[in-house]
């Protein structure tokens, strides 16, 4: 039986690969997509997501979400993904539009209609998920679990300790981590290992039309290089859903720092139980890299 999922995303070049896997992995049933400001503005992430859905002729409803964080000024990652978020490929024009309601309400409505609890996957800042929990707390029993790409048990990638998706809206992340829902965190500890090799990247143009498109996008992606390999951060959240055996997880207490002058956005991961608090997150700490790379190749070969 395919696993029903809703995907909250901020495309973003590595998001494009994650979206492809979410649509075409035979184990998954992607039923709803929502966008959030993150890598670029929410107008751009929505445009990019609609372009990808049209490219793959995927009839999946999409709702536009939060344009700004809960309480602070927005930040982006255009330096990594380019000003448009997905530069490098000329997508054809289309007439697709997002749903007429905000993302958190679209998630609420879809959860309430679902015959069983649904897995949420968030690969951008957690603003939409926090809004859902704050505005629609009655939805919590309908969430099977939340799988996120975000956070780190060690070093960060936008401050010394903070990972971008959490640092972009620390208050939202803190709300989500305190919520009591089941959370799996695929942070930098594993995503920095999730590298597609130069040899594999070179084969993409001959793979299929998606391979050609991704290869063009990757030439503008700044999380690694075509010569040294590219990190597929967001894809790890999808990979865990399909191949949890590739990941080493540990239950930990995790809090999000929202006040520190130098540490705001840090995920404080209590690996050794020093704080004596009950675990609230399953934290991915290690990855079977070769197994991950093999799975990626298998999935992308299924994409038209």
From Swiss-Prot:
NCBIfam families: PRK10768.1. It comes from Shigella flexneri. Belongs to the IUNH family. RihC subfamily. The keyword Lipid biosynthesis does not apply. Its EC number is 3.2.-.-. PANTHER family: INOSINE-URIDINE PREFERRING NUCLEOSIDE HYDROLASE, NON-SPECIFIC RIBONUCLEOSIDE HYDROLASE RIHC. GO terms for biological process: purine nucleobase metabolic process; purine nucleoside catabolic process; pyrimidine nucleobase metabolic process. This is Non-specific ribonucleoside hydrolase RihC. Disulfide bonds: none annotated. The lineage of its organism: Bacteria, Pseudomonadati, Pseudomonadota, Gammaproteobacteria, Enterobacterales. One of its GO terms (molecular function) is purine nucleosidase activity.
């Amino acid at each position: 039986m395919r696993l029903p999922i809703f995907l909250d995303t901020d495309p973003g070049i590595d998001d494009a690969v994650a979206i492809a896997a979410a649509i075409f992995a035979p184990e998954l049933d992607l039923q709803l997509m929502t966008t959030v400001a993150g890598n670029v503005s929410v107008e751009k992430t929505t445009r990019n997501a609609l372009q990808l859905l049209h490219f793959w002729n995927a009839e999946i409803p999409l709702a536009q979400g939060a344009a700004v964080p809960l309480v602070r000024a927005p930040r982006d990652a255009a330096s990594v993904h380019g000003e448009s978020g997905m530069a490098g490929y000329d997508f054809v024009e289309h007439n697709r539009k997002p749903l007429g309601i905000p993302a958190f309400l679209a998630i609420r409505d879809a959860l309430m209609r679902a015959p069983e609890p649904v897995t949420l996957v968030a690969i951008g800042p957690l603003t939409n998920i926090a809004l859902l929990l704050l505005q629609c707390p009655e939805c919590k029993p309908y969430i099977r679990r939340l799988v996120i790409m975000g956070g780190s048990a060690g070093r960060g990638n936008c401050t010394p300790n903070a990972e971008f998706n959490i640092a972009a809206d620390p208050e939202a992340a803190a709300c989500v981590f305190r919520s009591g829902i089941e959370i799996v965190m695929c942070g930098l500890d594993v995503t920095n290992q999730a590298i597609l090799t130069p040899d594999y990247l070179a084969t993409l143009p001959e793979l299929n039309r998606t391979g050609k498109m991704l290869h063009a996008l990757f030439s503008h992606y700044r999380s690694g290089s075509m010569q040294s390999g590219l990190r597929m951060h967001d894809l790890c959240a999808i990979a865990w859903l399909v191949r949890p055996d590739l990941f080493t997880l540990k239950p930990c207490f995790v809090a999000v720092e929202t006040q520190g002058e130098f540490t705001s956005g840090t995920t404080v991961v209590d690996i050794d139980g020093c704080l004596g608090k009950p675990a609230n997150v399953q934290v991915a700490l290690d990855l079977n890299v070769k197994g991950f790379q093999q799975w990626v190749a298998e999935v992308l070969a299924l994409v038209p």
